[in-house]
């Protein structure tokens, strides 16, 4: 009903503001609606104010940024191949990461979760020293909040409604998982923070840079839009240049970036996967380019650092330190490359007293133990790295995982610690929510495109899962129910 009401309102607004016939508007998808994709049979144009952007062969979406209705042809039938992630004590699989959602309704007004403490404005440059999360508040992700309010809440009842509303207010990261979002969503996200600061706040923006060519090389669920064989490195550098342009336009907004989840960790453990071996040089070149280009005074960057059940195994720690230490040096030791983000889209706890059975025999069975073991090895390579830890889905411990390497839509998990710079650790800058809880990790249907076997029910994944990035209501409700601290 909510979506129908929004569509009606959008149609009415279009009719009032434009001489075009209502019938023409009704033939085009509303903002955030689907406008193309494999086997899609709906509208292939967008209403005024949006443009149809191809995310992948299965999905195109109407994103803000065009003044006229636009069209896109349906993608041709094809398939993408990928080698599934491995699972062994020294080569643990990465966690899944979101791609563009299939339907995102209009954003709603949200309010920051903490009290404003000061601000800045256009024409100035934000700056900080040390921990970029210290002395600043985080702003809710309106893109994610809109999903919660219009995709999740309408079908909830009782106490879950209030819990979901609370989740919508928790600050989380906005993902730039396709190049088009740099021009459509990124300016709005930064403008929201600028406006809040102008009203007396002191807020930072949180973004994920995620569009490497041959992305997600060890899995199938989140393959991206760029291919190394088709000029992907050049296209990626243009994507980074576009991000830099937006950051310079909003130099008054302190911005925290997570750089390329599920990428370089594969270069440590998954060189036996042909796609990863073939992508290594491109991954390194692209990542170095990114951290050099985005090395701006108001920006803090964190490379993705896997998690305790991946790079945290003793046999993986030194090779990981060697790789990241060399990259840091090869990039010229960027001043704004603060450290690493761990546990992105995964389920690990921060600090446990008892090891879950599925973590045996790894002595680094939580993220605190992992970074405590990893940091000295990085320091020995010349990088005094600090860490941020994703706790968005780490509330329930132990989880329902059968094995630690099972990463996709795992059951028995819940929303976790709320974002905070009060970590009690000199190494940990902040607890954060990087993965948007409720967006699917990967499709569970073995016959579907982009199916990864880790997303099958035999691996503990929840059934009836849609494609990666699509809203997964049943999973979201589980996260609400199992939240710790409770919502």
UniProtKB/Swiss-Prot annotation:
One Pfam assignment: Glyco_hydro_6
Disulfide-bond pairs as recorded: 35-52, 46-62
Catalytic activity annotation: Hydrolysis of (1->4)-beta-D-glucosidic linkages in cellulose and cellotetraose, releasing cellobiose from the non-reducing ends of the chains
Keywords: Carbohydrate metabolism, Cellulose degradation, Disulfide bond, Glycosidase, Hydrolase, Polysaccharide degradation, Secreted, Signal
PROSITE patterns: CBM1_1 (PS00562), CBM1_2 (PS51164), GLYCOSYL_HYDROL_F6_1 (PS00655), GLYCOSYL_HYDROL_F6_2 (PS00656)
Further information: The biological conversion of cellulose to glucose generally requires three types of hydrolytic enzymes: (1) Endoglucanases which cut internal beta-1,4-glucosidic bonds; (2) Exocellobiohydrolases that cut the disaccharide cellobiose from the non-reducing end of the cellulose polymer chain; (3) Beta-1,4-glucosidases which hydrolyze the cellobiose and other short cello-oligosaccharides to glucose.
Record's protein name: 1,4-beta-D-glucan cellobiohydrolase CEL6A
The organism of origin for this protein: Pyricularia oryzae (strain 70-15 / ATCC MYA-4617 / FGSC 8958) (Rice blast fungus)
Source species taxonomy: Eukaryota, Fungi, Dikarya, Ascomycota, Pezizomycotina
